Amino acid sequence: MAKKALINRDLKRQALAKKYAAKRAAIKAVINDSNATEEERFEARLRFQSIPRNAAPVRQRRRCALTGRPRGTFRKFGLGRIKIREIAMRGEIPGVVKASW
């Protein structure tokens, strides 16, 4: 199981990303707008720098919902590969069966 601090750090990052999503999108639209003047774009870059770095969605990590494991996580289930195997072997995931050919 992952350390609680790492899991909480990711949760804080998710909350920050959600909080600043609209503001980030508006500022990035000005920065990427080719019709905006250089001054407007420069001011937008300064405002963009004032947003916390952890508000960027790219800094989030997908983790297993049960263990917090950061790697080997399946998006479809939100679980790590080890937990998927355990749960699938018990037959608790509908439609998932052990492969045989």
UniProtKB/Swiss-Prot annotation:
Keyword field: Ribonucleoprotein, Ribosomal protein, RNA-binding, rRNA-binding
GO molecular function, one term: structural constituent of ribosome
GO cellular component assignments: cytoplasm; small ribosomal subunit
Superkingdom of origin organism: Bacteria
BP-aspect Gene Ontology terms: translation
InterPro entries assigned to the protein according to its UniProt record, in alphabetical order: Ribosomal_uS14, Ribosomal_uS14_bac/plastid
UniProt KW Disulfide bond keyword: no
Cysteines paired by S-S bonds: none
Similarity annotation: Belongs to the universal ribosomal protein uS14 family.
Subunit (UniProt): Part of the 30S ribosomal subunit. Contacts proteins S3 and S10.
Function comment: Binds 16S rRNA, required for the assembly of 30S particles and may also be responsible for determining the conformation of the 16S rRNA at the A site.
The name this protein goes by in its record: Small ribosomal subunit protein uS14
Protein's organism: Neisseria meningitidis serogroup B (strain ATCC BAA-335 / MC58)
Organism placement in taxonomy: Bacteria, Pseudomonadati, Pseudomonadota, Betaproteobacteria, Neisseriales
